[in-house]
Amino acid sequence: MTLLPLSATAQEKSGNKDSEDEYKKSAVAKNYRTNMKAKNYGEAKKTIDNAISRYEEAAKDTKLYIYKIEALNELVKQENRKIYLNSKPDTVSFFNNIYELYETGLKCDSIEEVLLTQKRAEGKNTKNKLRGGIRNYLLAYRTNVVGAGKFFYNKKQYVEAFKFLDMYMRTKHAPLLTDSSVATPLNDPNDRVSVSTIAVLSAYASSNYRGVMTYLRESLTDDNIQSQIIEIGCKSAAELKDTTSMLLLLEKGFEKYPEVDYFFMTLMRFYNSAGEYDKALATVTKMVELYPDSRDYNFMMAKQHMMLKQYEQAVKSFTNCVKINAEDAESYSSMGNIYLMAAQDVYSGINVSVADPKYFEKKNAMREYYKKACTCFELAKKFREDKPELWLEGLREVYFKLNKGRELRSLEKFKK
């Protein structure tokens, strides 16, 4: 008995396997037609899907995609017929088959376009032969695509909602539907803004921040919920680490909707964290101008002045706070701290001898600041004795500096 070399045996087995796995277009087409004739549209589609996923040649064969479109169209019509027969249709399958029909049509058109581009490069005069037919299939379900997006949005299935709305918007520009050489025109209503708005809301609700940014510009023209859309854009840009877009949207939102806390507060945090205290001051100043009787905006304005070391202006703003609310312990405490700093600055600047008249001028100025600080801290204590962190350390210092021993001892029972 003659033994075959191991390598030859393996090669023969490999060859047999390749032969068994060879793409047979005629067999695929026959299987497809058999299932279509028997109205087994799901099986017909599965036959094409298997061939496309398994064989490279099949994946580039436009004829197979046309077959798949036909099968999908029958599946859609099958569900549609149930409506007229008072039978319960599978709405989700109905919509998903339409979506897949669109995907398949776009894929088929792109494959044909690649082939035509190659032929044109060779100097051949060619045109799309399949585009018109595919377009007719897609246009038949045009309203269903956007309808599916709204259906899933109302069901709070936001990933699915965005998928359909995105398909609807993308295909508004697809050559497959906009090619003027094809007789049937794309006749969408003027719904770009409304559909973009729902797409943005769906994308944000499903944490699809890139999806938000894709349709944000269009949706920003929707005046009905513009402030909400701008806020969504800001938050999405922040998630994407797109600081430039986030800041532009924040500034736009604050300019148009200063009453929306999100724009104001986020802008303030951004400017302060970036060390742009002057911009933060300008922002809060606008709010004080709009709401002069707001204690909170006046208080924030005072704090911004302090960050810029504009202490006199800060005291004026804190004074406005206590005019609005005479028991504002925080503002009294803040003014006390400013007067303490002023006293300490005077002390550090005393570099003249006791014999110099300026020495006593500075000592008196320092004492006046301590007195003002003392008054402020005592008022803070009066109105918020339960919050010693506002006044305890300040009073200890001013009582010591003003030689108020009895008052200083009275503070021993308090703990910060």
Residue locations for each model-derived region?
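Canonical tetratricopeptide repeat
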Residues: Y67, S181-P185, D191, I198-L201, ...
